[in-house]
């Protein structure tokens, strides 16, 4: 409307009338008063019809210089920017809940797993920070989505551009775009920004599914590392002793449909020559559904993390019972006894096999038993058996050493405060 005023296609008085009419239609829609007609083909023509009834023939001027093609492309870009920012806010809320669980647990021992086998001791905080890293990448991906959606398409018209000398800078400023399209044909046909949105959503969904699966596993009777809040678990209809992590299972299930949506839209747009087709009507359904499902999953996960608790004592027992410091013992032989690592590996493997047969953990094996496998072993080996020392011994900055974990936690506190 502002651009048409500048071109003197409509007067300032007519522009004010049009704006009041459009605001009235918006208010009617919020109150459910609008009755759409199939005779008007689509939402654009329905709105124009509503406006005509409210303000008369001046409504017939608003379509000057534009097409439904460039209008819907612009509207979709504006929606994608807003949706991406909303998702970023919910992801940050989830990250804050994860961070709050990590704080104070820099020295809380849990087993780190590979192949679902107890591998090495880590801290609960270190494990949770891994998810902060994932969700931080998701924030960055949505930044990428916002940047690629931030292109004004108005002026492309149907496909060839507009015959009216529209002030594109004015349009950009009015709609809060930082730039405009260079090519009108690409302007009306480009749905890459929708694909980026779906890809980013798919990646976030993947991380949510991963976290859900892990917490479900941790809440099982076999691990008991995670106690899910009763608000987000349900009882069995027949077995009174059970609590089921239904909320997490539903998040895990719903993330599958989110990930499929990027494939669905890709299949639609890959078959289309330039420029505009009715096929594009489907992109709204896909991205709207994706958004609704993803934001609900993030919100549920945030509440589950916030209101549940992690078991702080069982992790240590799991590490002891499943020889989690075996690698530390191999390093002991390398560092203190100068035995090549591959030879050290074999010696400790034999010791672990011996301990399993004797139903002992590594701290329960006596020094004379250790010396049966390597005579040079002395009492210093017990320093390497100790799980706390395993964390403290880590040297690299990305390690599970409590000092490094605390440093990273401080970084995330600052990151979430300023972002």
Language model: regions and residue ranges:
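Short, well-ordered beta-strand elements within core beta-sheets of diverse protein domains
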Residues: 1-10, 123-126, 193-203, 328-338
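A generic secondary-structure micro-motif detector
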Residues: 37, 121, 187, 319-320, ...
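A generic structural-conservation signal
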Residues: 13-14, 111, 181, 342-343, ...
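Charged, flexible cofactor/metal-binding loops and thiol motifs
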Residues: 77-81, 110-111, 117-271, 278, ...
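Short linear loop/turn motifs
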Residues: 17-20, 185-190, 347-351, 386-389
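Structural signal for hydrophobic packing residues in well-ordered secondary-structure cores
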Residues: 22-33, 51, 55-59, 84-109, ...
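Glycine-rich cofactor/substrate-binding loops
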Residues: 49, 54-58, 222, 239-419
């Amino acid at each position: 409307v502002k651009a048409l005023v500048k071109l003197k296609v409509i007067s300032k008085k007519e522009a004010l009338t049009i704006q009041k009419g459009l605001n009235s239609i918006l208010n009617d829609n919020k109150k459910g008063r609008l009755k759409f007609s199939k005779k008007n083909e689509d939402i654009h023509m329905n709105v124009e019809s509503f406006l005509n009834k409210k303000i008369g023939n001046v409504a017939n001027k608003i379509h000057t210089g534009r097409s439904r093609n460039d209008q819907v492309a612009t509207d979709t870009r504006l929606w994608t920017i807003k949706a991406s920012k909303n998702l970023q806010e919910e992801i940050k809320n989830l990250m804050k809940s994860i961070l709050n669980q990590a704080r104070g647990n820099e020295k809380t021992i849990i087993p780190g797993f590979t192949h679902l086998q107890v591998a090495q001791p880590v801290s609960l905080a270190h494990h949770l920070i891994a998810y902060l890293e994932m969700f931080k990448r998701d924030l960055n991906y949505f930044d990428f989505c916002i940047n690629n959606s931030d292109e004004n398409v108005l002026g492309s018209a149907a496909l060839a551009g507009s015959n009216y000398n529209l002030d594109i800078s004015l349009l950009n400023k009015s709609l809060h775009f930082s730039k405009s399209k260079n090519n009108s044909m690409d302007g009306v046909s480009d749905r890459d920004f929708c694909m980026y949105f779906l890809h980013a959503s798919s990646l976030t969904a993947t991380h949510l599914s991963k976290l859900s699966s892990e917490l479900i596993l941790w809440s099982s009777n076999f691990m008991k590392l995670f106690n899910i809040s009763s608000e987000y678990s349900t009882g069995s209809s027949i077995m009174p002793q059970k609590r089921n992590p239904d909320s997490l299972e539903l998040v895990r299930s719903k993330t599958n449909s989110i990930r499929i949506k990027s494939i669905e839209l890709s299949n639609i747009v890959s078959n289309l020559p330039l420029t505009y087709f009715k096929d594009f009507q489907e992109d709204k359904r896909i991205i709207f559904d994706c958004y609704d499902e993803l934001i609900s999953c993030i919100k549920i996960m945030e509440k589950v993390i916030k209101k549940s608790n992690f078991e702080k004592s069982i992790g240590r027992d799991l590490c002891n019972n499943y020889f989690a410091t075996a690698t530390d013992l191999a390093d002991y032989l390398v560092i203190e006894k100068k035995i090549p690592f591959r030879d050290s590996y074999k010696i400790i493997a034999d010791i672990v096999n011996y301990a399993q047969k004797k139903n002992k953990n590594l701290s329960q094996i006596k020094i004379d038993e250790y010396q049966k496998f390597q005579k040079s072993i002395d009492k210093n080996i017990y320093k390497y058996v100790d799980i706390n020392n395993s964390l403290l011994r880590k040297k690299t900055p990305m390690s599970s050493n409590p000092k490094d974990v605390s440093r990273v936690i401080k970084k995330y506190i600052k990151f979430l405060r300023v972002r």
